[in-house]
Amino acid sequence: MSKLYKRTKILATVGPAVFTEEKIAELVMAGVNCCRLNFSHGSYEERDEQIAWIKKAAEKKGRSVAILQDLQGPKIRLGVIKDNHYEVKPGDELILDYAVTEHDGSNLLPVQYNLAERMKVGEPLFIFDGKIRSTVTEIVSSTAIKVKVENEGTIMSRKGLNLPDTDFGGDVITEKDMADIEFGATRDFDYVAMSFIQSADDVERLRQILVSLGSTAQIIAKIETKKAIETDEKMEAIVQAADGIMVARGDMAVEAGNEVVPIVQRKLISLCRKHGKLCVVATQMLGSMVDNPSPSRAEVSDVANAVIQGADAVMLSDETANGKYPIEAVKQMKQIILYTQNHSKVDPIDQDVTGENREYNAVANAAVSLAEKIHADVIVCETASGATAVSISAERPNLPIISVTSNKRVASQLALNYANASFERPFSENYGIDLVQELKVSGYINTKPGEDKVLAVIVSGQPNVIGGTDTIQIRSI
């Protein structure tokens, strides 16, 4: 049995609440597997500090902790509102003008994006996370639109806008994003999360940029727009284009409706497992812990449901970035994960065995089936690229996976995958008993109480050859 036996992983957002080396270390010790750096806020100098702290904490704990760069994307916000307060009621008309820099108290509001270039008459526009709903009634000028308000509310400075029916025409990577991507390429982030994507083409564009910069970061596509979930086929195309998916439920609920979120979440988790892609469930999972030391019962059920559905990871946002109880939130999430995984089993799913990863998937299926039939304690996987480990993970085995690799980058990028614990070491021809013994000595594998042996299924192949996985062994040590 592995000491790292938390199958569903925890992704935590770094922010002011944990902006010290000591707090980052506490996050990692509490059970965080990946740290999210939100590039909507903060300076590059702050990012460099955080990266150094995360790597130091991971080294101290003796395990891989991944780092995710979350791009802001075309997040559209209002400008500064006079007195930070403007009341509206049904029937009111507002003019949102990109050319306006200062609000004078009238219905002419500054906005940080030229909506006139993208929006059409009749399209909805939601203000302040959907709290105020309106519809475009006129394109007033080359920089301004007029909207009619549908409900009462208060408009405040720099609140976000959602445009659920507006086509951005592939223009989802902003100038700020480009600068951040270039910065990230020099910092070797493990993952880059892409915001507000609308199609698989958006993912491919980011892929081309990363390749041109020499970055090997994996792409996490954030599913949060109405257009991204228009059809099952569109969702599947995005899943196939990306390396992973983040179910970003906040903006998705605003754009598509609250009732849509649970079904889309379930579909995306299934699609990711089918295609061997990472799936992260995010947004307000333990939201009440921003202000309270314990979660609500509904939040506990929310986290447990994501675990039961087979998500690779669950994410904490404001809970760790700005909350009063960041470390407690991680501990609570870990406790929920452990209890749920020990009292439930993720339903099996058929992986795609016709695509380019069919060999990996077939070997993975055989290894997991064998491990469960003989009640193995652990699956040990030697992997050069990480592909075999990901395929085994997608099968959602009810036991830990120790992924042995000589590639530090691969070890780090596997940190978020379901049930995976990375063990970095050079490959050798002499695998099997010696490898399992080494894992026991290093503390990665422990015997069960009352037993003196470990039963392991070992998946391996030709050393340092990508695509060479072809051998399954059973070893009792």
Regions found by a protein language model. Give the residues of each.
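Non-catalytic helical/linker scaffolds that mediate oligomerization, partner binding
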Residues: 1-477
